[in-house]
Amino acid sequence: MYGRLFGKQVLAHINSNCQRDSDIIREKALRRISRECGAEMDCALLLNKMVDILQNARLTINFNAAKIDFVSLLKHKEYLNSYALGCRPGDLPAYNVGRDSVETKAFELEKLADSPYAPYGQTGGFSLAYTPKSRTFSSASRPIYAALDFLLGENGGASSYGKSFFELNDNVKINCTFSPFDIYGHRFGLDTSKLSTFWHMENLIASCQNDFFGYNCFKSLVKMAKGEKVLVHSNYGTGYEGNYIEAHIYSDVCLFRDIKHVYLSLQESSYSKS
């Protein structure tokens, strides 16, 4: 319970940052729209529509159906993060060591060191077995990773992590922070100012990628806001840099409460081979 309370403080901290700079963030987003779409556009109206698209986008958690442990999932009745599992399925045992370092900087955890719940959110480093040294550390203090799938990708919002996915209920988005890039990648650059919350989606629009080739987040949002048809590029949701909007869930993800739909890819199913 105390770990989850620390996670809520992280969410509140990021939201406070966005609230503090909300006027600056909105002006930055408006300038970008004006610069890239033309001054003759009603930039404020377009921005409001883009925010609405993001707030109404579906939230997905991708997984590989051939690798996920459904028995364990049903046993716990909730989706667990890599700290609770000990590592990310299919990844190196030291995965959480790097993840902890990135999260500590990206979410400014050191600024919450005076919190009474801080001991439950600090790993204290890792043992040779790659387990947190701190006995008070709680895996619930750290987020569950998802994607904001505003383009309704055939395989969810981050198919590089598996072509199957859970679609979560809309209310879960209120418990999230969002990044225009994977926080592990160099594009994010451990820059906390790029993070947003449900109430401050303008920050995503101000910072999202605008690549010339492949999936283009900014131009896709502009087209959707204008009511134009958007073709989903094949590299949407792939890679670990800028091809999807990353979400960080600071709440439990209960199977029978928070998951709206389950999509299983036949490419990952054992039935497709029989």
Which residues fall in each region the model found?
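Active-site-proximal loop/hinge segments that shape catalytic or ion-binding/gating pockets
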Residues: 2-32, 40, 48-52, 57-58, ...
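Short N-terminal binding/cap micro-motifs at the start of the first secondary-structure element
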Residues: 68-73
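Short glycine-centered helix-capping/turn motifs at secondary-structure transition points
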Residues: 77-78
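Short hydrophobic beta-strand that contains or immediately precedes a catalytic carboxylate
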Residues: 145-148
